[in-house]
């Protein structure tokens, strides 16, 4: 089975070797047909602690690394703007 890949924003980098990534997707409401945004947070492995809050990253599904962590950060697509 192919590993899923998602894009999201790092919302927390306070843990060692772990970041929390917020992934948003658009879904059509089953009854009313309106497009609504759904978001979910994923814990992802960050081996070198190189990703910071606000970075746009790609995460890929992996084997379970801990109780809550099943994803690995593969690349940074946009750097956070400091200010």
From Swiss-Prot:
Keywords: Ribonucleoprotein, Ribosomal protein, RNA-binding, rRNA-binding. It holds the Pfam family Ribosomal_S17. InterPro entries: NA-bd_OB-fold (IPR012340), Ribosomal_uS17 (IPR000266), Ribosomal_uS17_bact/chlr (IPR019984), Ribosomal_uS17_CS (IPR019979). GO terms for biological process: translation. One of its GO terms (cellular component) is cytosolic small ribosomal subunit. GO terms for molecular function: rRNA binding; structural constituent of ribosome. HAMAP family: Ribosomal_uS17_B (MF_01345_B). One of the primary rRNA binding proteins, it binds specifically to the 5'-end of 16S ribosomal RNA. Belongs to the universal ribosomal protein uS17 family. Part of the 30S ribosomal subunit. NCBIfam families: PRK05610.1, uS17_bact. This is Small ribosomal subunit protein uS17. The gene is rpsQ.
